[in-house]
């Protein structure tokens, strides 16, 4: 019989044994409740909230999601945050003006980051920084 799920702890144990990163983050998919005008009405407050999360070390990454043809934005976005638990992640997202106002709803999924690479390029002569 095919197995359809396994305990998350089994994955954590395997990752630890392999020496991989094993960094627990939370991915938030946030979607419009149907009215782009409602999203636009709170966009400035939302962006200020996001920058505050970033300054406090909570925000890992965030940004808008385009349509599949990459031509339009319909009010959706993805946020990746650092939190100690799913409950804390929910508390953080409930405080977002987008969700408080009802302009967007959200779904949170725990994400264990194991593989990948971050490359930062710094130009000494100009001070320019580039993330690749």
Regions found by a protein language model. Name each.
Residues 1-132:
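Conserved, structured core segments of small domains
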């Amino acid at each position: 019989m095919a197995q359809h799920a396994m305990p998350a702890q089994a994955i954590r144990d395997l990752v630890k044994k392999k020496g991989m990163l094993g960094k627990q983050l939370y991915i938030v998919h946030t979607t419009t409740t149907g009215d782009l005008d409602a999203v636009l009405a709170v966009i400035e407050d939302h962006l200020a909230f996001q920058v505050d999360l970033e300054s406090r070390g909570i925000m890992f990454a965030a940004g808008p999601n385009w349509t599949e043809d990459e031509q339009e934005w319909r009010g959706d976005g993805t946020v990746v945050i650092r939190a100690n638990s799913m409950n804390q992640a929910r508390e953080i997202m409930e405080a977002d003006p987008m969700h408080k106002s009802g302009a967007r709803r959200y779904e949170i999924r725990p994400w264990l980051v194991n593989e990948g690479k971050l490359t930062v390029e710094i130009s000494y002569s100009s001070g320019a920084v580039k993330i690749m």
